[in-house]
Amino acid sequence: MAVVHKIGGDGAGTQFVPCWSCKGPVAGRALFCHTCGAIQPPGVTDHFTRLGMAPGFDLDDEKLEKQYLGFQRVLHPDRFAAKPAKERAIAESQAVALNEAYGVLDDPLKRATYLLQMKGVISEVAEDKTVSDPALLMEAMEKREALSDAESADAIETLMANEAASAIQCLSDISRAFADDDLEAANRAVLRLKYSRKLLEEARLKRAALES
């Protein structure tokens, strides 16, 4: 087991772990050893921290992409082509962790679900369970029936426009709920967004089938 040293008199501060290569101290979130320069394995950290973003639902999309692309360049396989097999494997694991983090944070639904998990709320979205909210289930059923009854591309387009507006409203509701630290409201809005996305995808498929 790696020994963790924490710098900071009050228990806060930077955590250091031994470098796998030279055993020198390495900041827990550092990509490379400060002493020997060896790339370090991805530590146990949240997706926001991994990408250098402050935890929260409202993110600067341009900054998120810039951070991601910057780390991607640092972890590009060409940079490690001449390194030993272990370093190449570690670089690959870092890239996998980076891609996973970006995949979550770049998607508002996944980001909101992940943020709820960080706050101790396991949404039905995360567990892919049937939603237990009767009102939401009824609303979803009614919308799917309306889609089933739609017999023209124009009717489907109208339904999609209405649902796209609902999805945008869900994003606004999620943002406000997290700002107010109302996790119950955030979870409800996340579930509504899940159903909106599912309906929109089904509508796109039906429209494509009609037009083919």
Residue ranges of each PLM-predicted region?
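C-terminal accessory/regulatory regions appended to core domains
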Residues: 1-212
